[in-house]
Amino acid sequence: MSFASDMKNELTRIDVDEKNARAELSALIRMNGALSLSNQQFVINVQTENATTARRIYSLIKKVFNIEVEILVRKKMKLKKNNIYICRTKVKSREILDELGILKDGVFTHAIDPDMIQDDEMKRSYLRGAFLAGGSVNNPETSSYHLEIFSLYENHSEGLAELMNEYELNAKHLERKKGSIVYLKEAEKISDFLSLIGGYQAMLKFEDVRIVRDMRNSVNRLVNCETANLNKTVSAAMRQVESIQLIDQEIGIENLPERLKEIAKLRVENQDVSLKELGEMVSTGTISKSGVNHRLRKLNELADKIRSGEHIDM
């Protein structure tokens, strides 16, 4: 199963009391429900592609309203593998929609009903229902960090974003072609949201993966930095050796001042060491990195004069 499926499976096993079941069910039916007329009575169909979510809807309706619920299974068309699960209720449809704040004075409302989010537990339950209905989260092992909840109605998405931001999640909403989404892009905020709606095992797995990814990225950055520094050191050393060899051909290293002569010999003999290490090899006593750099720069300047044909005074 995918990371998102594992998470939804975990969320559907959370035990809730009737009050919080009502809040969760309100989100599920508002987002995935449809009303139809059959044999002169209203029928509520709540549709999902996730079998565990279908079982959750079934159990929540039974818990809150204690009525008969059917579960139907449909095959998707056009070679799609997933089944479609439909939870259907044929009685008390008007009462259900009224009590869940989906129907107000005979009119369907798309905004979150304040009665469904009266306290912290109900808010968490509503968000859990919203994620079960329209949520997805990228696998943190293979993708960029991204969690989103799709809703058909923009004002409902705005309400979800406001609700999530009560918990400082930095949620944003965006209009899409057939609806709108609320999304999180920051790994820390995604982790907080998973915990908020009760997905503690998913949160722990997400955090484990995030830590490994962050460590791997840090190591890669360190290796890249050290490689770049090493390449820079090697390039500089090669140029210094070329300059010293040119000086030896044209003037002779033995004719250089003593302080330049020794550092020239040391550099040719130790081409892969750093300036600091080179300074520690000087026979007259350790000299600083800047001191070594100053002497090598003098040698490069002398070689440049030779290359340009300038007169050299020793």
Curated annotation (Swiss-Prot):
Q: Annotated DNA-binding ranges?
A: 274-308
Under SUPFAM superfamilies, the record lists: Homing endonucleases
Keyword Signal belongs to the record: no
For this protein, what is any one GO molecular function term?
DNA binding
Q: Which domain of life is it from?
A: Bacteria
Swiss-Prot/TrEMBL keywords: Cell cycle, Cell division, DNA-binding
InterPro entries of this UniProt entry? Homing_endonucl (IPR027434), Sporu_reg_WhiA_N_dom (IPR018478), Sporulation_regulator_WhiA (IPR003802), Sporulation_regulator_WhiA_C (IPR023054), WhiA_LAGLIDADG_dom (IPR039518)
Give the UniProt record's GO annotations in the biological process aspect: cell division; regulation of sporulation
Family of the protein in this entry: Belongs to the WhiA family.
Report the protein's function. Involved in cell division and chromosome segregation.
Q: Which HAMAP family match?
A: HTH_type_WhiA (MF_01420)
What protein does this entry describe?
Answer: Probable cell division protein WhiA
Q: Which organism is it from?
A: Staphylococcus carnosus (strain TM300)
